[in-house]
Amino acid sequence: MNFLRFLMFLSLGVWIGCLIFLPIVAQISFSMLPSPQLAGMVVRNSLLALHWIGLSGGGLFLLCSLIDNRITRGKFAWLRLSHILMIVMLALTAISQFSTIPRMDALRATAGEISTLPADSPIRRQFDALHSTSTHIEEAVLLLGIILLYLTSRRLTSARS
């Protein structure tokens, strides 16, 4: 049981840590690399890796939490707030990974270097809107993750009392 709880905290902590670190990678990439296109590719690939970390870690968290509930309470308790938050985090991450990013990639393939397009270009506006959506998704996942970390900490601390 302690090992399950350790895995819950580890998986959630790694995911939250990656979400916090990604903007740092982005800032350094855009300030140090010779072109915005190259920096964008570094950030894109980092984000894809982050999503796989999140999807696998989130799945592990959910599985361990359900098993922990079964052991300690005799039921899986699917509708716990912590499970709902994790499912929302996983859904948002999947939307970004399998919908938003591929659409951004398609625009890049069509237009080439997005940063060279005029600001009023329809492709540029569409890309910027998708980029904004992607940013908001990551912010939402981070906020939900922090809330979930707090709730999980509180739940597991009160379970010991």
Model-derived regions: residue spans:
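Interfacial loop at the N-terminal end of multi-pass membrane proteins
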Residues: 2-80, 106-128, 160
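Hydrophobic H-region at the start of alpha-helical membrane spans
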Residues: 9, 83-87, 137-142
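Hydrophobic alpha-helical membrane-insertion segments
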Residues: 15-16, 85-101
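Transmembrane alpha-helix boundary/anchor motif
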Residues: 21-25, 95, 99-102, 147
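Hydrophobic residues within alpha-helical transmembrane segments
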Residues: 52, 56-59, 88, 133-136
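Transmembrane alpha-helical segments in integral membrane proteins
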Residues: 60-71, 138-159
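Alpha-helical membrane-spanning segments of integral membrane proteins, especially the hydrophobic core
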Residues: 79-91, 125, 129-133
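Alpha-helical transmembrane segments of helical membrane proteins, especially in multi-pass transport
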Residues: 93, 97, 135-142
